[in-house]
Amino acid sequence: YQVLSSPRDWPSSAQQRCGWRSCPWSVENGGVPRSVFVHETIDIVGQGQYAYMEHVRGEPTNRMPGMTTLQGSFFVLGFGGGRWPQVVNIWDCGADGWEGWRRNLDRLNLKRRSAFYGDWWDEASRWRTGGYDRVCAGVPGSPTTEEIAERGIRGSLFVNEVFTVRPGTQVEFLAEVVDCRVPVFADHGVVATGLWE
């Protein structure tokens, strides 16, 4: 889940849900840095989604300390609703939150790109024509990539929902998702792997 806006405050009642960590997000209020993710929607050439996802798993910085980590790479089902062929990649910018995002963004400039990637991007262009990125911040109740791994969360079908809400209501909306939808999903064996705005 993601809501695209920046919150002013997170209700204290929403800081502890569903057995996940309580984490006030505001660094200014003495909290820890927020987890930051990049949600990429990639336009795929023909039926190249499988080859592209395999290529993404070999992204050079994926195993470097302090760089992004691929949380998951998913293809959009043509029969499942939505635009296709596409692949959705979720990149975790690390424990440093916004600073981790800044550091990873810096490595993409033209002078540094060759040092990190070599021919990786040129090869990736065989399977993709472009895409759209969203920079998202995790909210209380959203597991980190490490927590997902520790809990052994895996699946063959992931539902990716993007909502647009009235400006200024994204925090309230996500608190309701944590309060109301997450428990209902859990009753049916469905686990939220990302709650981002």
Kindly give the residue locations of the regions a language model identified.
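Short, solvent-exposed polar/charged micro-motifs at secondary-structure junctions
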Residues: 82-85, 143-145
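An amphipathic, aromatic/His-enriched active-site/gating alpha helix that lines ligand/cofactor pockets
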Residues: 1-24, 31, 50-74, 79-84, ...
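Short amphipathic alpha-helical patches
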Residues: 75-76, 87, 148, 196
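Extracellular/lumenal glycan-associated surfaces
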Residues: 41-42, 91-93
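Residue-level detector of short, conserved catalytic/binding motifs and their immediate flanks
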Residues: 38, 85-87, 131, 159
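Surface-exposed interaction/gating patches
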Residues: 23-24, 31-51, 139-197
